[in-house]
Amino acid sequence: MLSVNKFTDISKLACISAAVSVIAACSSTPSTSLAGEKAHTLSNAVLYQTSSKEYPVLSSFVYNQAIAALPTRFAEGDVVVMDVDETVLDNSTYQKERESNGLGYSSKSWADWVKREEATLVPGVADFIDEVVKRNGKVALITNRDKTLDNHTWANLLAQGLPLTTSNTCVVGRIAADKEAVGQEGMVNDKDLRRTQLTQGKIACSNTSKDASSTWAAPHTIIMQIGDNIEDVGGVTQESANVDSLMPQVGTEIFILPNPMYGSW
């Protein structure tokens, strides 16, 4: 038979054990920290993009809908206009690295990330681009990455195994003129100038070789716009966009992907 003192000793041990467990739990390093550095909690937005099952489901669903809306075969001059970041390339690793170190966005750190050419593909985009190419289509990647980084963007895209060539794909980053054009007739957001140049056959593709330049020197017809931001759609801004007016085109000509990490909002 156990003595009262024995019960007391056991109770003390249990309390000590529980206390140690609590202390250990409180002092353990969160999984979001980098080795040897102070731990920082990731935002819900980054956790959603990098860890949730909902994000790849939604992204893949949008691209499946876009595939269903593609023509059986593209007509001469038809083109799909796409954004790059969080539309084709997934930069959540950059966001995660910055937040893990208690840092936010900076133009220098972003440029350094782009130069690493390590962004992965947004779920569903590979199948979509495969279908565009199979149907004799073309893609214009109108990105607000600085135009001086276009070569790195192109290299990153090719490294991901996408079936892109200088004939079927045009990469065009932003320059000062794109922002300066806003407010001029027909120029509502800072991608509208490049969209207009595309339709006029005046688009300046950074990745286009001399042999392929003639394929982009003719006027093009934009049949679909895909992005993660409402301003990836021509003629609207976050402030001016009328969702009710846009909805008849959503699912046929306009496709918007989820991006909780950043945006014009």
Where do the language-model regions lie?
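Acidic/histidine-rich, surface-exposed loop or edge segments in extracytoplasmic proteins
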Residues: 39-54, 108-112, 135, 172-174
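Second-shell loop/turn segments in exported
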Residues: 48-57, 111-119, 140-146, 178-185
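Metal-dependent phosphoesterase signature
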Residues: 89-90, 95-121
